[in-house]
């Protein structure tokens, strides 16, 4: 049988210590109380808390009005940045299209003048330089291997005439005449290699 305790004690009817909300051991105005098999707010919260809240709101009202009437600093700073030009990162985006078009035309003119002043190199010269670089690389490799004594590569009959890879032999810059000449002059060697493979 539960003990009847007056509600003026902020405990409720027949509320024991183990039946406090959330397992609380000490009674407080923040904890709800168990009344007639359901939890409700603490005793006296319906009137007293509302009065306290209204009083706090009335006390803070002048401060809120001062804050509301204060000028907004962020839009002012943004407006100033926009007028002055902003950061260097976004300054180009704010320039007018006319200014940007003029700057592009100047850059194109400078690049065109630099390209016209540069010496033009024909494709045949590039191909000759590539062939020379391949020959030099092969000669250096052969020399390095023979000096080390590891799998020495015998020198070919002619160091100037180097058999090039197929991609280089049929390079577009060689032209039809050079490709035909290469096929005619290497036909005998190819036939001999085919005969050797068959035997």
Swiss-Prot record:
It comes from the Viruses. Residues 2-23 form a propeptide. A motif (Nuclear localization signal) lies at residues 189-199. The modification N6-acetyllysine is found at residue 26. The record marks 23-24 as: Cleavage. GO terms for cellular component: host cell; host cell nucleolus; viral capsid. Plays a role in the inhibition of host immune response within the nucleus. Interacts with cellular nucleosomes and immobilizes the host immune danger signal HMGB1 on chromatin. In turn, prevents HMGB1 release out of the cell and thus decreases inflammation. Also plays a role in the wrapping and condensation of the viral DNA. May also promote viral genome import into the nucleus. All late proteins expressed from the major late promoter are produced by alternative splicing and alternative polyadenylation of the same gene giving rise to non-overlapping ORFs. A leader sequence is present in the N-terminus of all these mRNAs and is recognized by the viral shutoff protein to provide expression although conventional translation via ribosome scanning from the cap has been shut off in the host cell. This is Pre-histone-like nucleoprotein. It comes from Murine adenovirus A serotype 1.
């Amino acid at each position: 049988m539960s003990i009847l305790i007056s509600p003026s004690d902020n405990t409720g009817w027949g509320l024991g210590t183990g039946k406090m909300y959330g397992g609380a051991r000490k009674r407080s105005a923040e904890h709800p109380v168990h009344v007639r098999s359901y939890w409700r707010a603490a005793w006296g919260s319906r009137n007293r808390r509302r009065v306290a809240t209204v009083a706090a709101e009335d006390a803070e009202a002048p401060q809120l009005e001062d804050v509301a009437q204060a000028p907004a600093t962020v839009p002012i700073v943004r407006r100033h940045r926009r007028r002055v030009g902003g950061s260097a990162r976004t300054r180009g985006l704010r320039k007018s299209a006319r200014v940007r078009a003029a700057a592009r035309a100047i850059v194109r003119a400078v690049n065109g003048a630099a390209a016209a002043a540069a010496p033009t190199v024909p494709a045949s010269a590039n191909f000759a330089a590539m062939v020379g670089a391949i020959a030099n690389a092969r000669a250096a490799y052969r020399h390095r291997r023979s000096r080390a004594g590891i799998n020495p590569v015998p020198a070919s009959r002619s160091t100037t005439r180097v058999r090039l890879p197929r991609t280089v032999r049929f390079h577009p810059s060689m032209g039809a005449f050079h490709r035909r000449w290469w096929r005619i002059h290497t036909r005998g060697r190819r036939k001999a290699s085919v005969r050797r493979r068959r035997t």
